[in-house]
Structures are given as C-alpha cells and as structure tokens.
C-alpha cells in the first residue's frame, strides 16, 4: 500500500485548495474501483460541480460542515453523512467554514 498525496488548486472550477490522499494504488483497487481516498478541502475552498460518466462516487463525511450540490439541489453535510452520485449525474462540495473539511471518497467504475 503506497499512499499518494495530491494537491489541487481550483479543481473542477472550484475555489482554493484541496488535497487528495489516495489510500490504495490502482493495482490494489482492481477494475471495479477507480479511487479510494481521504479528501481535505481547505477553509473557504471548494471542489466545483462536475458530472460523472462511466462511474459513480460516494462521500462519507469525517470532519467539518459542507454545502453539497447534488445536481440542482444544495444541502448541508455533517460528519457521518453519506452521499452517492450515480453515473450521468453531477455534484460539487464547498467548505464555507474556518476549519478543514475532511471526507472519504470512493469512485466505483461501471461494468
């Protein structure tokens, strides 16, 4: 298991910085999982709205409070909340707070 940390600025049209710690490498994930990672979004930053094609994504919230856009609907997420964005659908997430937003992200490939 080789963990890899990636830093992104204004990812998918968002604002500020986010950090993705990939917990498993592709060889460990197999063909069904595209990404399993711990994601941190800096205070007052966001991951912009984007659509999924050929895969779906789930978030499990760990720390902080988020504004989550699920297609056309926005809602607040707190630790313990889970989301799922299906193939062909879109989402984005914003950290409006003064502390980092931390969540697990799992991207599952369609077969």
Give the label of every model feature segment.
Residues 1-33, 48:
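A short, N-terminal "cap"/entry segment at the start of jelly-roll beta-barrel domains
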Residues 22-25, 37-53:
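Conserved short histidine dyad/triad with adjacent acidic residue
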Residues 38, 58, 72-76:
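Short, surface-exposed secondary-structure edge patches
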Residues 40-42, 51-68:
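Short, conserved beta-strand element in jelly-roll/cupin
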Residues 67, 87-111:
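Ligand-binding loop in jelly-roll beta-barrel domains
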Residues 73-87:
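Short acidic-glycine-tyrosine-enriched beta hairpin
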């Amino acid at each position: 298991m080789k963990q890899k940390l990636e830093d992104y600025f204004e990812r998918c049209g968002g604002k500020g910085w986010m950090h993705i710690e990939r917990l498993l490498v592709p060889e460990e994930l197999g063909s069904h999982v595209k990404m399993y990672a711990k994601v941190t979004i800096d205070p007052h930053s966001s991951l912009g709205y984007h659509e999924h094609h050929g895969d779906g994504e789930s978030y499990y919230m760990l720390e902080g409070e988020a504004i989550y856009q699920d297609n056309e609907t926005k809602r607040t997420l707190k630790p313990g909340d889970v989301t799922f964005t299906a193939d062909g659908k879109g989402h984005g997430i914003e950290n409006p707070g003064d502390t980092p937003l931390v969540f697990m992200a799992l991207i599952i490939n369609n077969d």
